[in-house]
Amino acid sequence: MAKGKRTFQPNNRRRARVHGFRLRMRTRAGRAIVTGRRRKGRRSLTA
């Protein structure tokens, strides 16, 4: 039985562009995400 390829192919540049800090700061909702994580005391705010 043939299985498909693994779906997670790590790529740091894509990770940063899709989930990164600059992207989060671009929208109001993204800033809300970062604010919430700051308030919660998360060590890592974004990817």
From Swiss-Prot:
InterPro entries: Ribosomal_bL34, Ribosomal_bL34_CS. Keywords: Ribonucleoprotein, Ribosomal protein. GO terms for biological process: translation. Gene3D superfamilies: 1.10.287.3980. Coiled coil: none annotated. One of its GO terms (molecular function) is structural constituent of ribosome. This is Large ribosomal subunit protein bL34. HAMAP family: Ribosomal_bL34. PANTHER family: LARGE RIBOSOMAL SUBUNIT PROTEIN BL34M (PTHR14503:SF4), MITOCHONDRIAL RIBOSOMAL PROTEIN 34 FAMILY MEMBER (PTHR14503). GO terms for cellular component: ribonucleoprotein complex; ribosome. The gene is rpmH. Belongs to the bacterial ribosomal protein bL34 family. PROSITE patterns: RIBOSOMAL_L34 (PS00784). It comes from Mycobacterium sp. (strain KMS).
